[in-house]
Structure formats: C-alpha cells, structure tokens
Amino acid sequence: MLNSFDAAYHSLCEEVLEIGNTRNDRTNTGTISKFGHQLRFDLSKGFPLLTTKKVSFKLVATELLWFIKGDTNIQYLLKYNNNIWNEWAFENYIKSDEYNGPDMTDFGHRALSDPEFNEQYKEQMKQFKQRILEDDTFAKQFGDLGNVYGKQWRDWVDKDGNHFDQLKTVIEQIKHNPDSRRHIVSAWNPTEIDTMALPPCHTMFQFYVQDGKLSCQLYQRSADIFLGVPFNIASYALLTHLIAKECGLEVGEFVHTFGDAHIYSNHIDAIQTQLARESFNPPTLKINSDKSIFDINYEDLEIVDYESHPAIKAPIAV
C-alpha cells in the first residue's frame, strides 16, 4: 500500500518509464522524458516527504530558507552540511586561474568510472568546501552561484535598474487582496540566464486563496524525477506552510506542474528499487516559532513521525 503522496510520485515514475521518450540532454547522460504532467498534494493530510526512500528534511529546509533569504552563496548551505549545490560552484572554481590542482575536467562523469580519479576529486572538493567555510574572501569569489533563485525571488532587477522584492510583494498581496490572480513569483529572468550557475528548473509559482486556505502551484520546466522532484515537492509544500502561517491562513493544496519530467538513464535501477517498496504514513510539519518567514531558522522547524525506507544513492548530472 502507498499513502497518497508516495502514490502520486510513484505514478509519475511509472508513467515516464512506460511511455517516456528516450532523449539526449545537456549532461550527455541520456534520459527518458515526458513533456507535461501534473501532481496534486492535499497538504491537510500531512507533509509530503516521501517515505519509499529517505528524503532529508534538513537539506530541503535549509535550501528553501537560503532562497527566502535571497542568498546565492553556498557558504550558508555548507554551514548546515548541505552539499546539493557544491558541484556548480566547484565547476566555476576549477575553470578559474586560481585553481592549480589536478585536471578536474568532466569530473561528474569521470568520478563515476575512474576510482583513482574519484579519490582525487573527493579530496579537491573537500579542500574547496573547507576554504568556502573558512575564507570569506574565497567564498565571495567562488561560492556565489550568480543570480539564481534567491536573487530573483528577493531582488529582481528590471531593465532600468530598479529592484523588486517579488516574495515580499506576493505575501502582502495575499494578505490584502487574497482573490487576486497575480500572486506570482518567477525565477526565470531571461536577461540574466547567462549569469546563473544553473538556470532555474523550478521557474514560477502562483498562490491561490479559497475558504481560508492557501494553495500553491509550481511550474517546473525541467525535473530530475529521482533526485530533484522529491526535494521540490517537500520544498514548495514547506513554502506554502510558511506563507500560510505568515498570512494567517491554513494550507490547501500543492499542485506540481511539469514541463520536461525526466529520469536519467543511470537512475533507472534506483527508481525501480524505490517503486518496489511500500510506503509508511506521511509525517507532519511543526513550525515552532512566530517569527516572520524572513527571520525563521531551520531550528524553528520540526518534522514529526517521519518513518521511511533507507535512502537510495544515485549520481547527480552536472
């Protein structure tokens, strides 16, 4: 048996495996892909942290709070031992004149196929992370990912150089004009794509208020189904909870709409392992603070009664 959250995710995986198109991709890994899909999660029934594999709430929450703070430097994430953005910052570093270590070209693929190189890569990454944490000047130069999510959410700059805080504006709109159809935040800024370490995969979200409940719909242009989507589901569910609390509302639905939803060819075995598992009951979320969404910390958040199967490792495509 599967709870409704795991069942929705499993249905996406199964459909892509069954009818998806085999495609090449930017990372030269290869994918099975479906264009256009939608999942719905009733947040009143629990918190959608998948249980058929362990998903780290700490990683989900610290990344989201990083976005909310408008931060774009991995130093904040590394202080919470959150490594999910390391590869993109590291790639910029090894391409710079500052780097003088062993050749790290195409480290993502080489680390998977060459054990000796993998040890070199892990050592270089370890040194890189340590310098980011200990050397603020180095972190400022090589830890920053450019104008990624947090920058667009909190400090969108228009063609005239005016700065606009999308997230704060949307929260005020929800409070004062809940029926508006303009509760939208976009991370997709076409004029700044080239200034981002990775263009936004989850590109735009919209809020909807009905009967005192706040719902959120995300449009995700590109979705790594195995590694990314479980985090994205939990992240936007958490964002919905935080904004609902900020606005004095209950939570409604999280609606997840996909463009290119894909399974990487080297994730298929891992996906099939997960699909063979039964689920546990979903956990619940507690927000143990009355702080503003802009001041809340990871330590103020708590996941209650989370039981899951073990995590399943798979390589990230860079």
Swiss-Prot record:
One Gene Ontology CC term in the entry: cytosol
Principal location listed in the UniProt entry: cytoplasm
Residues binding dUMP: R26, R181, R182, R221, S222, A223, D224, N232, H262, I263, Y264
EC identifiers of the protein: 2.1.1.45
Enzyme category, top tier: transferase
InterPro entries: Thymidate_synth/dCMP_Mease, Thymidate_synth/dCMP_Mease_dom, Thymidate_synth/dCMP_Mease_sf, Thymidylate_synthase, Thymidylate_synthase_AS
Active site positions: C201
Keyword Cytoplasm on entry: yes
Gene3D superfamilies per UniProt: Thymidylate synthase/dCMP hydroxymethylase domain
Location of the protein in the cell: Cytoplasm
PANTHER family: THYMIDYLATE SYNTHASE (PTHR11548:SF9), THYMIDYLATE SYNTHASE 1 (PTHR11548)
Homology family: Belongs to the thymidylate synthase family. Bacterial-type ThyA subfamily.
Subunit text: Homodimer.
Protein name as catalogued: Thymidylate synthase
